[in-house]
Amino acid sequence: MSLSALHKYRLQYKPVLPKHIADIDNITIEEGAKTQSAVNQKELSELFKHTYGLPICNIVAGKNADIHRVIRCGFILSGGPAAGGHNVVAGLFDGLMKGNKENKLYGFRCGAGGILSNDYIEITAELVDKHRNTGGFDLVGSGRTKIETEEQFATAFKHITALKLNAMVVVGGDDSNTNAALLAEYFAAHGSDCVFVGVPKTIDGDLKNQYIETSFGFDTACKTYSELIGNIQRDAISSRKYWHFIKVMGRSASHIALEAALETQPTYCIISEEVEDKKMTVSQIASEIADIVIERHKKGLNFGVVLIPEGLVEFIPEVKALIKELNNLLAHKKEEYSKITEFSAQKAFVCENISESCAATFKNLPDNIAKQLLLDRDPHGNVNVSAIETESFVSGIVKAEIVKRGIKVPFTPVHHFFGYEGRCAFPSNFDSTYCYALGYTAFILLALKKTGQICCISGLQKPAEEWICGGVPLTIMMNMEQRNGEMKPVIKKALVEIEGKPFKFYQSKRAQWASAEDFVFPGAIQYFGPSEVCDQPTKTLLLEQN
């Protein structure tokens, strides 16, 4: 592999460790009181007989001989890549080597699938050094395989036991860490001493709570998207004739859209959670944006930038109801529907077989969106929401609203989707440092035999030296949700809180940004220079923690 000049410099970057975990000879774990989940306590306690109710683990000053015990540790990188994953591995590896030179680290290839296929590599110092502070998950690859069936759990147990592993780290989002909790329970129930620890990863930012201030990768992804949005905003005020509709990743939550809005001050940003809370209709969304387009036209501002979260359509009550009925219809009448080839006939068939209210919603959708709702199905037969061109949908309904009003306004929409661009960028200094500390924390938790925990670090708005590290039981974050027709234990996703400080701040600025040229241009992620340019966390985190 040929290296760019930046790549060479990033390999040399030395993340700062929080002071209180830097000296492993003088640390131990202080356990808090027993814990419980916020909801579904009875169901979860029955499913996790050996790991439910574990205490929170605080890393404190003290002595613990187990820190130097011999560890054979495995890990997986699970789900979509997020910037900083390689530094989690680097922190874990460095901790293991400091604990005992006899320690071993193995990476299973392509996520949990590598555990099931027994496909792994030994991680060496040379291999780690080639990946420090780099983006992506290419060190061992990632995957979305879940360990769900009894046969799969037995296979995982067989392969992990055969490799004589006594520790496993699962780097992933809510689903992956749910799997980590289930594996911790399975191994404990079968008498294994293998310790399972999770690490919070997701660019979507929806794996957070009172214990986890942010998931890694969110910082880098938001800054990457914000650079691109800023570039487009500069183009908008240069050309002065385009309305840019930009979809950003975030199917289940609008954290990325909100953070990007806080960083760039666009003309308008839709927040899915607000749409759901206000029970906004398609017509109301169109009307709100059309009002802005028309008012800006009166000021000679025939341009603008609108940010849209990827999962918007699932938060619009009438469209959500339509999707549910479409899923049921196309599941139960799949054979009958498959014989219809013309879209007009498909549309008529659908409207005849769903409720009157949903039929009205379906008829009012732009044809390209209606077709996507019918044609794009996921492996479970459901509408593939992430494939819907939401940005085109929004600009389409806005254009229709302007036409309906009979007002002649220049309106030339341009569409963008920023997704994969943010997943594998060189991690920001924040993510590089945060991930290294997460990996080091994972080492401490597994060395001190604290299974069923997920790494957590608090005080992230402060300098890294002052961060406080520890572990929180995975089961404390769980609830029961319906998945594929069955109630399953899952870690609850964190949505944007409309009463939270980040949204309230945006809400206070929204009218000002909509009516004027008030764009901000963040520029590219900076790695060298003043701390206020290079090391600042997201505005979301600063607003939440200050």
From Swiss-Prot:
Keywords: Cytoplasm, Glycolysis, Kinase, Magnesium, Metal-binding, Transferase. Non-allosteric. Competitively inhibited by PPi, Pi and fructose 1,6-bisphosphate. Mg(2+) binds at D174. Diphosphate binds at G80. InterPro entries: ATP_PFK, PfpB_PPi_PFK, Phosphofructokinase_dom, PKF_sf. Optimum pH is 6.4-7.2. Substrate binds at T202, I203, D204, K241, Y242, M249, G250, R251, E310, Y420, E421, G422, R423. The active site is at D204 (proton acceptor). GO terms for cellular component: cytoplasm. Its cofactor is Mg(2+); Mn(2+). One of its GO terms (biological process) is response to glucose. The record marks K201 as: Important for catalytic activity. The keyword Cell wall biogenesis/degradation does not apply. The record marks D175 as: Important for catalytic activity and substrate specificity. Pathway: Carbohydrate degradation; glycolysis; D-glyceraldehyde 3-phosphate and glycerone phosphate from D-glucose: step 3/4. Its EC number is 2.7.1.90. GO terms for molecular function: 6-phosphofructokinase activity; ATP binding; diphosphate-fructose-6-phosphate 1-phosphotransferase activity; metal ion binding; phosphofructokinase activity. It is found in: Cytoplasm. The keyword Ubl conjugation does not apply. It catalyses: beta-D-fructose 6-phosphate + diphosphate = beta-D-fructose 1,6-bisphosphate + phosphate + H(+). Homodimer. Catalyzes the phosphorylation of D-fructose 6-phosphate, the first committing step of glycolysis. Uses inorganic phosphate (PPi) as phosphoryl donor instead of ATP like common ATP-dependent phosphofructokinases (ATP-PFKs), which renders the reaction reversible, and can thus function both in glycolysis and gluconeogenesis. Consistently, PPi-PFK can replace the enzymes of both the forward (ATP-PFK) and reverse (fructose-bisphosphatase (FBPase)) reactions. This is Pyrophosphate--fructose 6-phosphate 1-phosphotransferase.
